Amino acid sequence: MAEDGSPATIETTTVHAEVLDDTDPTHLRRVAELRTTGVDVLDTLATQRASLRSLTPAPGELELTETPRWIHYPWRRTVVRLLGPLGFRRLRLDRNRNKITTAEQEQLSQLRIGIVGLSVGSAIAHAIALEGTAGSLRLADFDDLDLSNLNRLSATILDLGVNKAVLAQRRIAEIDPYLRVEAWTCGVDEHTIDAFLDGLDLVIEECDSFDVKVLIRDRARRRGIAVVMETSDRGLIDVERYDLDPDRPLFHGLLGDIDSASVAGLSVREKIPFGLRILEGSALSSRMAASVLDVGTALSTWPQLGGDVLLGGASVAAAVRRFGLGEPLPSGRVRIDIGDHLDQLREPHLPRDSTSSAADHTVRTDALDVRSLYDTCTDTDAVAFAATRAPSGGNAQPWIIDVDTTRLTLRIDETRSSTVDIEHRGSLVALGAALHNARIAAAHRNILGATEVSFDGTARIAFATGTDPQLAAQLPGMLNRGTHRGAPETDPASTNLADLTDLAAGLSTETHRIHLIEDRDTIDRLAETISATDRIRFLTDRLHREMIAELRWPDSNDLDTGIEVTSLGTPAAELVVLELLRRPDVMTHLNHWNTGQVLRSETTSRLTASNAIAVVTQTGTSAGDYIRGGALAEEFWIHTQSLGYSVHPMTPLPLYATAEHQLRHLSTDRIDELTTLWNELKTLTDTTDNNPATLILRIFRTTTPAPTSRRRLPHHH
């Protein structure tokens, strides 16, 4: 019975797609019977299974071993063999990922949605079914397909005279026979509305009748059911969240305090002003507004275009996703007006920091004549200049260099630190490299006096008559030293590393050692570990922002610091990927999905193809220990490059952590993974918390020179 006591007449379809199970003898007899009637049989099960097995990640055992089904479509006189519901859904919806994740797809499959009006509503139902964003659909329309509907409704002339709800139901069954779809061929009225709304989470209203529009909202409000409407003119999306605000007025209050009782008995003419208020006449397109005035004289009804209806289907499908996932979808209206957007067509703007602009520039290997600049310096300035040529993480140059006639002083610039620079240890290593360079220049200019490294991490060189031939001989190599981030060009196993082994042994001291890793298995494991820490750096918002901030494009205003993108060793054609890697919102999604393994690929490939990995280690963790370790690393780098090798320093995320609590400073969300990687790194590099790594260097052969990076000028007094 309906609410007013009158009998409710509900008409639904009785001709559905039959789903027949291979393991049910009764169903198998039905399939055999159908074959005798001359139905067409379509069996591509082998191909479907092959496609299912090829998916990444691999399907589970239940999906792979599930019993297939036969689907009988009586209106097509066809029987189709398909994967069972689990495998079918996994394969059919696989290309949704990760616009819709697997977990989100499962959440959306619980939605129960009703659609009233299957002209515009047909496109909406189709879009929802395509995306698999509902577990059941209830479709209501009393009208049959007319030839005049074929300008906007996806059907064919073979469907003329078929009820519109039935047409939508059939179309969906041919997309997903496992999706529950009810077709209410009686439409919706005062007697059937309550039964229609029973169990629904959301109702989409696309009917022509003003009375029914009011009725649906009135009863949906009583039940706390949200209502969405799309009007194809200028792409109007209308959302009324009665589930969140059951006291809100119908139609956002545009019609005042109205309900279904207050509009009962109004004439068609009396309803026209209400319709115009709902449509907001001032916001109609000019063609639609003019057409409304012609309805009944020059036009039989208001116009609708197929493209606009299809857009409406996509728009409402997007709203359904938000609703089902609990994402922001407030009550209100918005217009998705394609015409307005087409009026805004413009030539694309190429930002100065785009990868396209970077691709137009080649790697600059001789833009700076470092030796000529050095030769033009006074003796004290030459020492300061040499200090600036030291390497540092992200080319941050985290030092303050003061020079006068008596000495050069180096100290940490804490403003140039980063999260990875735990307790400024990376900065101290860079300071040590700068100190070594300065001593080389002082020896070359014959002004090398006493060197002092203070407990607080300050380093000084006094200027006095003096030299060191071994230091002075390193000048050409020091000025030519550079970071090469490119890929190796030779087989890593084909190079004899005896010269490198001798160098590492000769430079090692009792407190600071150079450990050369040549074993291919160890290098491969290091590549896996270090690349995994790189992935965490990408996926952790603060670390990602700091990393991207280090990059410099050719037209940047600050090329004296940071890393020029043209020096990354990435082929110009692949630089476009940087446009994705630099976006925090992209990394946020990958982090949420726990994916993004591709973020490891470049580090992995570069490390595994290297000839050797050098690990500079130290005894102790004082500031002086890191400074002296940095000086040793720089000396080794200079000599290694002079032997014809290329060098690329690697900074695994936990490199400068010497206690587990310091890892939380890096990434609280991935602390367990990071702790595991930290322990693996220490094992592979033979380091401990008291004998940590100073620096890790990737060493390889290539015929291309390292690009020359720019530097800030030192301070003078």
Model-derived features: positions:
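Glycine-rich phosphate-binding loop and adjoining beta1-alpha1-beta2 segment
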Residues: 81, 139-176
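Phosphate-binding loop/pocket of nucleotide- and phosphate-handling active sites
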Residues: 3, 31-95, 319-381, 395
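Mid-domain beta-loop-alpha active-site segment that forms a flexible
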Residues: 301-324
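Glycine-rich adenosine-cofactor-binding loop
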Residues: 104-146
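A structured beta-alpha segment of the ubiquitous adenosine-cofactor-binding alpha/beta core
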Residues: 165-201, 207-213
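Acidic, surface-exposed loops and disordered segments
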Residues: 308, 328-717
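Short gly/pro/ser/thr-enriched loop/turn and capping motifs at secondary-structure boundaries
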Residues: 145-148, 233-240, 656-657
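E1/E1-like adenylate-forming module used to activate ubiquitin-like modifiers
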Residues: 2-59, 199-307, 346-351
